[in-house]
């Protein structure tokens, strides 16, 4: 028995050790057990427990998704593009603590928090945290100091910032690659902080896409191979590169650099990429290190002259060359023919001329992309172009002066690889060649803005890869070919302004990727097909100015991306379907991002001009060519033309933005569902047969900018809820059957009477006052708004009677005091009732809201100057003779201004604000106290203010010579003539005042309404900027642009305001530029017969191509012809201020610096000025970004 037990024990022991041995071999090593625990603990903190399904504690971690092992150790983890949704602390505690980890890649993994307070092992060499939501100071990266072996660090595309004053440095001397691009880093000492401890082994440094300024000194980084400092605020000079013999990639684009850069890069002999685009370099191209260069971009600067022959030294290695956006002229140099490796050549937006240099181009055997757009090439397309197009991927000849037919054999080569063909904005005639279908790889075909005739070839239906078909503004006729149904990749179909007939082809229902359909201004008929509702990507549908008929299909409400619907001027009937709006709050419009457009806002000056405006695709077309539309469109092409690139940012929460159904035969009611569109900014239902009342829900359209319900059969009252439409700049309710009082709150008091006419029962400002006996409902309206002048008069009469009874018991002094009081009360009563001698200014007579005569008379002025502190409202009444019309010296968007002579004989100006109902006393007084403290010799000081009931009066220092507008444009009336010396003083003074508001006030003040009528002149003709802070006050201190400002000052408003409705200091700079142009030209910003269809800005640009000095005021040239050079110098300043790209405009401090340079004698030649004017930035429609922003909660 004992023997058996021993045997059993031995067998059991042997079995146990054998099993243990086998189990150990099949399972992770002991070192991996700890790592399993760390990895699983990381998974456990993920919100989505199903995200890493194969990460399990009973598995070998080396088999986990994204995990790599070596020698039974986890050495690499790659979870890029997985939505981890965790804080960085979870990463540092679980993953970075893995002892054997060498690489951790977490790009685009939804990681947030600060990079601080952690340690990592010395084995970590690569860490990629790019494209996340990391925040906090970039200085927290010093926590990585424990990662002594770290060579690769990428934290780009986060929101890291720079704290300003810091000590020490990054202390990562082992780094070879450092990428801080696309964060929120700003300041002048960033590069110094990064490199404060030397460069170590650094080979790759990228800090692009921030707001860094100061110096870039990398002279100690002798190993540096890659340097990208693009898209920052560097302006002080060229980077200090030192010995850059190892540098291969240098990108300094998108800054404000100028000067001689060739010396700084002279030792960079191994450069393969050099990008200095979008800076401020001028003159001829300087010598460059060309030996190894593969890509060279000098685009978007101000280089001049012909292309120098020394660039041929790069032909042995050069594959890409971009010289676009400069001022080069002459012919394309023949030496390009020897650049056999060149694949991309961009010479757009220069002044090259002549015929296409085919001999040179055909020698460039490797050419794939050829962009010669926006030049002055002319003639017919040569037959030899067929041989070139066979090897090209992109051919862009848009916006030149080509003529004749489009070559029928352009695509005859069976090996043709052409993908993009841009021939728009030329003078091509004849028919569209059906043989274009032989270019079977075509993705984009753009033939708009020519003189092409005939039909659209049905053969285009065989282009199975075509995404964009743009043929607008030609003379095409016939029907839209049914064969387009086979182009299932089609996204953009733009055929406006032709002579097309027939119906929308049913085959287009197969093109489910369509996002922009624009068929306006043709002769199309039939109904809107219901299948359009199945186009889930459709964002823009334009069918205006055709002969479509039938009902508007409710299926349009199935379009999940529709933001722009223009159906005006057709024959539609029936009702507006409520189902159209069921996608509101769910729309995502990302499908049209990056599309170039112009929007022409109709001015309503011609009866034939229908609709709110016209949205046009505008890629590759010169802005001045818009005049060609006048032959096909009855509307004026005025200064109200806005453009840019669409960049929608809806996150599935958007709504329609533009809805125009005007000039049809629609009937029925306005559906209440129309109020569900928070992003709608234009609504036009005018000129239909719509009846019923305006639904209260219209008041929910808080982003609404333009509302037209005119010429319908609407009845009832204007909903009081519409007072909440604070963004409203235009309204037209005329020609209806509306009745009752016009709402007194919101924007209604800013609109002229014409917008409410021909509504028999409508009353109240700006129409005649309502008769209380007309309706019981109005009596209730009266009571809810306090006592009216009639009841006020009764109170005054009772007070006078009581005084008469008591007078016998009073002494003489008391009697005299009562006499004075009765006189003042009578004056107030007479004025408030509108029975005084106020001329025809009815608006003032009906507009006062006072709470008790005695209280009003005794209210003191809240003064910022001691001599005024005892003034009362009664004193102001007396000083203006009851605000008599004779005392009126000006009117503006914020109210009327009166001259008041005080008892001591001094004069002040009193501004009576338009009603700002809804703003509390606290906000008003706080704003006044802020404005009253602002003192500067070039600002009109606020002396005091007075609140009487709902009325607000502001008291200013009186300016003897009134406004610049009056003095400049009506010198006889003003009694003074402005010579150049005075105008220059006014220009500098107003700039100095505006600069003080922008840069010396905390927080800075945006004027929002800078114009010549807001530049006042004192007794010394010194400029004083007025009305600063008024737009902010009138919009209840919101950061949105004052609506009344937009409506009241055409010609001064920068283009970007009409897209984002947000103001900025750079918007003030634009407006100042217009004022400076007024001083130089002597012309008003709009409505001059010299301008034609332009405004002042466009007119000056036109003259830049002729004789620029012709724009100057002839009176100045008579004064001294030698002034021309100085006037040109000041014109250059105006040009800089008027750049359509807001980010390129100078600040007002920089404007002052420009004036200082001019005074110091640093001249600017006339050719330089002309070139600046011809630069794209001066156009009235160039490069204005349109952002369809998600509005924060509570702002709508």
Swiss-Prot record:
What quaternary structure, including any partners, is listed in this protein's UniProt entry?
A: Monomer or homodimer in the plasma membrane. Heterodimer with BAK1 in the endosomes. Interacts with SERK1 and TTL in a kinase-dependent manner. Bind to SERK1 in a brassinolide-dependent manner. Component of the SERK1 signaling complex, composed of KAPP, CDC48A, GRF6 or GRF7, SERK1, SERK2, SERK3/BAK1 and BRI1. Interacts with CDG1. No interactions with PSKR1 or CNGC17. Interacts with BIK1. Interacts with B'ALPHA, B'BETA, B'GAMMA and B'ETA. Interacts with BSK1 and BSK3. Interacts with BSK5, BSK6 and BSK11.
Residues modified as Phosphotyrosine are: 831, 956, 1052, 1072
What are the transmembrane regions? 793-813
User: Outcome of mutating residue 1048 to D, per the record?
Assistant: In bri1-115; brassinosteroid-insensitive dwarf mutant, reduced activity and no interaction with TTL
Q: In which tissues is it expressed?
A: Expressed ubiquitously.
Q: What is this protein called?
A: Protein BRASSINOSTEROID INSENSITIVE 1
Task: State the gene name recorded for this protein.
Answer: BRI1
Post-translational modification here is noted as: Autophosphorylated on Tyr-831, Tyr-956 and maybe Tyr-1072. Phosphorylated on at least 12 sites, with a preference for Ser residues. Transphosphorylated on Ser-887 by SERK1 and on Ser-838, Thr-846, Ser-858 and Ser-1166 by BAK1. Phosphorylation on Ser-1166 enhances the kinase activity. Glycosylated.
Q: What is the effect of changing residue 911 to E?
A: Loss of kinase activity; dwarf mutant
């Amino acid at each position: 028995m004992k023997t058996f037990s021993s045997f059993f024990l031995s067998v059991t022991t042997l079995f146990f050790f054998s099993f243990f041995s086998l189990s150990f071999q099949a399972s992770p090593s002991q070192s991996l057990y700890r790592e399993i625990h760390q990895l699983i603990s990381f998974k456990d903190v993920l919100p989505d427990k199903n995200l890493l399904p194969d990460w399990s504690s009973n598995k070998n971690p080396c088999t986990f998704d994204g995990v790599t092992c070596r020698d039974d150790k986890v050495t690499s983890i790659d979870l890029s593009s997985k939505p981890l949704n965790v804080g960085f602390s979870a990463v540092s505690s679980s993953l970075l603590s893995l002892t054997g980890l060498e690489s951790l890649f977490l790009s685009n993994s939804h990681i947030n928090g600060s990079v601080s307070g952690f340690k990592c092992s010395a084995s970590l060499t690569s860490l990629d945290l790019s494209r996340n939501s990391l925040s906090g100071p970039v200085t927290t990266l010093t926590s990585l100091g424990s990662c002594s072996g770290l060579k690769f660090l990428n934290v780009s595309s986060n929101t890291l910032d720079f704290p300003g004053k810091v000590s020490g440095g990054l202390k990562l001397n082992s780094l070879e690659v450092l990428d801080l691009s696309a964060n929120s880093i700003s300041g002048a000492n960033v590069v110094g902080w990064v490199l404060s401890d030397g460069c170590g082994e650094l080979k790759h440094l990228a800090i692009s896409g921030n707001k860094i300024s100061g110096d870039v000194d990398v002279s100690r980084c002798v190993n540096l191979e890659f340097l990208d400092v693009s898209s920052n605020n560097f302006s002080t000079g060229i980077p200090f590169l030192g010995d850059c013999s190892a540098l291969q990639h240098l990108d300094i684009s998108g800054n404000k650099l100028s000067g001689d850069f060739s010396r700084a890069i002279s030792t960079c002999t191994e450069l393969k990429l050099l990008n200095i685009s979008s800076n401020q370099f001028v003159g001829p191209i300087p010598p460059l290190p060309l030996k190894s260069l593969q890509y060279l971009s000098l685009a978007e600067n101000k280089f001049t002259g012909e292309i120098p022959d020394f660039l041929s030294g790069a032909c042995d290695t050069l594959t890409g060359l971009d010289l676009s956006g400069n001022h080069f002229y002459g012919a394309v140099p023949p030496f390009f023919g020897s650049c056999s490796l060149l694949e991309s050549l961009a010479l757009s937006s220069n002044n090259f001329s002549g015929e296409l240099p085919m001999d040179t181009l055909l020698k460039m055997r490797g050419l794939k992309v050829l962009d010669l757009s926006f030049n002055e090439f002319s003639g017919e397309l040569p037959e030899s172009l067929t041989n070139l197009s066979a090897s090209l991927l992109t051919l862009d000849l848009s916006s030149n002066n080509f003529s004749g037919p489009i070559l029928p054999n352009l695509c005859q080569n069976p090996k043709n690889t052409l993908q993009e063909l841009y021939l728009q904005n030329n003078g091509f005639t004849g028919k569209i060649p059906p043989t274009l279908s032989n270019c079977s790889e075509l993705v984009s075909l753009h033939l708009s803005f020519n003189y092409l005739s005939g039909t659209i070839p049905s053969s285009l239906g065989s282009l199975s890869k075509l995404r964009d078909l743009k043929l607008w503004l030609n003379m095409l006729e016939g029907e839209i070919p049914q064969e387009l149904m086979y182009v299932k990749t089609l996204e953009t179909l733009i055929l406006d302004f032709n002579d097309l007939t027939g119906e929308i082809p049913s085959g287009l229902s197969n093109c489910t990727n369509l996002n922009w359909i624009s068929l306006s201004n043709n002769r199309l008929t039939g109904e809107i097909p219901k299948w359009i509702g199945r186009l889930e990507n459709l964002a823009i549908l334009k069918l205006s100015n055709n002969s479509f008929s039938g009902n508007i299909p409710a299926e349009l409400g199935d379009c999940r991306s529709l933001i722009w619907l223009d159906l005006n001027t057709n024959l539609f009937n029936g009702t507006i379907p409520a189902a159209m709006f069921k996608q509101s709050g769910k729309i995502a419009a990302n499908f049209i991002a990056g599309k170039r457009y112009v929007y022409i806002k109709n001015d309503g000056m011609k009866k034939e001009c229908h609709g709110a405006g016209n949205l046009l695709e505008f890629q590759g077309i010169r802005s001045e060519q818009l005049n060609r539309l006048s032959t096909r469109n009855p509307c004026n092409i005025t200064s109200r033309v806005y453009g840019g690139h669409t960049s929608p940012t809806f996150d599935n929460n958007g709504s329609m933005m533009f809805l125009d159904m005007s000039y049809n035969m629609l009937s029925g009611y306005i559906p209440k569902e129309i109020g569900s569109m928070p992003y709608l900014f234009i609504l036009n239902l005018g000129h239909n047969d719509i009846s019923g009342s305006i639904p209260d829900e219209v008041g929910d359209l808080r982003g609404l900018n333009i509302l037209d319900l005119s010429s319908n059969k609407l009845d009832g009252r204007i909903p009081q809820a519409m007072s909440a439409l604070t963004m409203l700049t235009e309204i037209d309710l005329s020609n209806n059957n509306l009745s009752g009082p016009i709402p007194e709150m919101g924007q209604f008091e800013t609109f002229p009477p014409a917008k409410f006419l021909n509504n028999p029962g409508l009353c109240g400002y700006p129409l005649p006052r309502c008769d209380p006996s007309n309706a019981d409902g109005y009596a209730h309206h009266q009571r809810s708004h306090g006592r009216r002048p009639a009841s006020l008069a009764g109170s005054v009469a009772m007070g006078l009677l009581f005084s008469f009874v008591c007078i016998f018991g009073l002494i003489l002094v008391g009697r005299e005091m009562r006499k004075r009081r009765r006189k003042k009360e009578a004056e107030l009563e007479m004025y408030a009732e509108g029975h005084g001698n106020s001329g025809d200014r009815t608006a003032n007579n009906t507009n006062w809201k006072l709470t008790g005569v005695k209280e009003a008379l005794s209210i003191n002025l809240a003064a910022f100057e001691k001599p005024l502190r005892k003034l009362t409202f009664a004193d102001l009444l007396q000083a203006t003779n009851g605000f008599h019309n004779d005392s009126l010296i000006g009117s503006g968007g914020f109210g009327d201004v009166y001259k008041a002579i005080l008892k001591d004989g001094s004069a002040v100006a009193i501004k009576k604000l338009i009603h700002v109902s809804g703003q509390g006393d606290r906000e008003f007084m706080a704003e006044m106290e802020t404005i009253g403290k602002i003192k500067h010799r070039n600002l009109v000081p606020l002396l005091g203010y007075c609140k009487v009931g709902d009325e607000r009066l502001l008291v200013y220092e009186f300016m003897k010579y009134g406004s610049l507008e009056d003095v400049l444009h009506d010198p006889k009336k003003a009694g003074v003539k402005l010579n150049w010396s005075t105008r220059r003083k006014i220009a500098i003074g107003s700039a100095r005042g505006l600069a003080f508001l922008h840069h010396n006030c905390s927080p800075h003040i945006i004027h929002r309404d800078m114009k010549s009528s807001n530049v006042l002149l004192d007794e010394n003709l010194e400029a004083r900027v007025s009305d600063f802070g008024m737009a902010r006050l009138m919009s209840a201190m919101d950061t949105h642009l004052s609506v009344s400002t937009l409506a009241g000052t055409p010609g001064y408003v920068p283009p970007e305001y009409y897209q984002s409705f947000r103001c900025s200091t750079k918007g003030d700079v634009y407006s100042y530029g217009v004022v400076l142009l007024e001083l130089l030209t002597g012309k008003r910003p709009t409505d001059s017969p010299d301008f034609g269809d332009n405004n002042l800005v466009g007119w000056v640009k036109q003259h830049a191509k002729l004789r620029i000095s012709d724009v100057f005021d002839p009176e100045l040239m008579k004064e001294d012809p030698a002034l021309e050079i100085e006037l040109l110098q000041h014109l250059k300043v105006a040009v800089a201020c008027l750049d359509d790209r807001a980010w390129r405009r100078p600040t007002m401090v920089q404007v002052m610096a420009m004036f200082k340079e001019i005074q110091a004698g640093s001249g600017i030649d006339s050719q330089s000025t002309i070139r600046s004017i011809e630069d794209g930035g001066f156009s009235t429609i160039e490069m204005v970004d349109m952002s369809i922003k998600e509005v924060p909660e509570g702002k709508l």
